[in-house]
């Protein structure tokens, strides 16, 4: 279960003005009063344009970024109180794959698994299953530097799931992936949903949301504009597409 209450995150930005002691900066809220709850086994999709606060929200929940105020509780553990324990229960894929170019796909997964002290017999079996599900078997000995953006995304997903986490957070997992690859990735997300994992994923692809997400949050300029079930989202405009509803929410 995930419980987020009144999360705020502020940063300082350059105003372009000069003061007595140099550049004048102003604070702004990248995330402004985010609250929601997610039960075990549910899937939440966070939607919104670039810069709306999706990534900042996910990083705070995953314990990668300290909130300015507010709380995030994952599986009854306060993230701010015990980041290490929370991180051991979470698989977090950033929207920047952050892979080592000189390593092959196999070496990348082995390195991450050993770093997290996952027994060989466990991570090998898990990796084989994920490679097969993501249609990656022809690329396992290729260096990261030689992979397409889509294949790098898939490698990052395997790295995220290799320790079989209870909670999975995916930040725009299909970015830069072709249509076939998007379908393969979302099939995997649906598969891990069936295993009872709790999942949060952000996306620009509204078509990915309808058949997988149990709940939807729409963000703009750091604020939550909609929070409800997929059915409630569609019920706002029963005869309109997901895209049309999204446009109405974010332009209101």
Walk through the language-model features, giving the residues of each.
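Helix-to-loop junction immediately C-terminal to a conserved catalytic motif
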Residues: 62
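Catalytic Walker B motif of ABC-type/P-loop ATPase nucleotide-binding domains
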Residues: 168-171
């Amino acid at each position: 279960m995930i419980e987020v209450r009144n999360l705020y995150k502020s940063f300082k930005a350059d105003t372009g003005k000069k003061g007595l002691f140099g550049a004048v900066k102003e604070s702004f809220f990248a995330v402004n009063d985010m609250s929601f709850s997610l039960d075990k086994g549910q899937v939440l999709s966070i939607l919104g344009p670039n810069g709306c606060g999706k990534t900042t929200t996910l990083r705070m929940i995953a314990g990668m970024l300290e909130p300015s105020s507010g709380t995030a509780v994952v599986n009854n553990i306060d993230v701010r109180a015990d980041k290490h324990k929370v991180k051991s229960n979470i698989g977090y894929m950033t929207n920047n794959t952050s892979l080592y170019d000189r390593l092959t796909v196999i070496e990348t997964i082995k390195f991450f698994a050993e770093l997290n002290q996952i027994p060989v017999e466990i991570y090998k079996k898990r990796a084989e299953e994920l490679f097969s599900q993501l249609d990656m078997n022809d690329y396992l000995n290729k260096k990261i530097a030689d992979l397409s953006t889509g294949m790098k995304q898939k490698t990052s997903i395997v790295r995220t799931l290799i320790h079989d986490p209870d909670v999975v957070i995916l930040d725009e997992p299909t970015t830069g992936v072709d249509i076939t690859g998007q379908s393969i990735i979302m099939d995997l997300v649906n598969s891990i949903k069936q295993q009872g994992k709790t999942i949060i994923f952000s996306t620009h692809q509204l078509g990915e949301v309808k058949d997988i997400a149990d709940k939807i949050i729409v963000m703009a300029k750091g604020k939550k504009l909609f929070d409800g079930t997929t059915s409630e989202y569609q019920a706002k405009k029963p005869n309109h597409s997901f895209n049309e509803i999204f446009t109405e929410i974010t332009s209101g």
